[in-house]
């Protein structure tokens, strides 16, 4: 089956446009615009066919992740970082965190935390996945705690959002104009946890640099 180009950044750019129109923080808006500009011109990943997450989450999710990468073309230059896009949906703004833990030279473990709009706390939606040079393979997808707390319809919608953005961001990891930068650690205390604070002690951000033939400034 021949490969066809897939624009992974389209939905993210559309959601970001809504965020920018309502954003009162000029510095945050500028950072988001810079990121959107970078991903709009970044190299796009390739899929051999379209796949979508269906009602049978485990089967469809595994099918999609296994088919996500062309194993001969995969190139993941970074080992650990966190990115914070903002989603605008029917219930308002939903911040999401994507954390990539690298543990050797050939693979990256991925964990996604998404903010629960009902409890205002952070839930680990996909507790583990592994990207290797041989392709993409799910090691563990633990949503049992969410299933105990929320109806199936709500759970499925949250997982769909997390999976969709996970694919978008992972697909952009091979872009040569994206670099990783570590932020100072921040201790997490009980009062911060009650406010829905981020569940990580150390944060990482993406620093986007212009292409060699671009006149843009560094973010």
Feature locations, PLM:
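Intrinsically disordered, low-complexity regulatory segments
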Residues: 1-211
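C-terminal, beta-strand-rich globular interaction domains
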Residues: 214-219
């Amino acid at each position: 089956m021949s490969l066809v180009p897939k624009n992974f950044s389209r939905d993210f750019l559309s959601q970001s446009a809504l965020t920018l129109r309502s954003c009162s923080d000029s510095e945050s808006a500028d950072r988001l615009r810079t990121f959107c500009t970078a991903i709009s011109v970044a190299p796009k990943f390739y899929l051999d066919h379209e796949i979508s997450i269906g009602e049978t989450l485990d089967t469809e999710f595994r099918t999609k992740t296994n088919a996500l990468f062309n194993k001969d073309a995969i190139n993941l230059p970074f080992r650990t970082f966190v990115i914070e896009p903002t989603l605008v949906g029917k219930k308002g703004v939903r911040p999401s965190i994507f954390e990539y833990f690298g543990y050797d030279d050939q693979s990256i473990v991925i964990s996604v935390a998404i903010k629960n709009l009902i409890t205002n706390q952070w839930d680990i939606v996909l507790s583990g996945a592994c990207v290797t040079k041989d392709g993409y393979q799910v090691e563990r997808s633990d949503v049992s705690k969410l299933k105990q707390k929320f109806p199936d319809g709500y759970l499925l919608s949250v997982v769909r959002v997390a999976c969709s953005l996970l694919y978008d961001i992972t697909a952009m990891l091979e872009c040569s104009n994206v670099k990783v930068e570590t932020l100072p650690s921040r201790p997490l205390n009980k009062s911060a946890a009650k406010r829905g604070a981020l569940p990580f002690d150390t944060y990482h951000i993406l620093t986007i640099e212009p292409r060699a033939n671009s006149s843009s400034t560094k973010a």
